Amino acid sequence: FRVLSLSTENKLPNVTGNEIGFEMTPVIDLGLALPCTPGGQMQGMVNIRITGRAAKKDAPDESLAVFSASYEALFLYPKEADEADVSARFERETHQYMLVAQAFPLASSHFRRELMAMGFNLGNLPLGL
């Protein structure tokens, strides 16, 4: 698991005492990479992009802070794994959920820590799916 990018901008000098609304949008993509060389490993990939926006409750159209982050989780299948078997598993929603369920809490926790570092305490931000 790794952070690919993080970008934040906070226009508020102090968020304490302000009634702030926050919107968060996660986008999750899954992929299966097949090896292009003999003896290579298949890889399952989960890419997560999270964007967020903070605004005063009485002026929701005026962004006070914007946040965006990208994350990647990589899952290596054993070298001896059968390509047809892994591909069939990867098509099943339960297998996809298993991969995302391992990656999303890490991304969400990191995103929340970065928001806290900027003065936004969002205890109700979802950490799981």
Which stretches of residues belong to each language-model region?
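N-terminal intrinsically disordered, cationic/polar leader segments
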Residues: F1-Q102, S109, R113, A117-L129
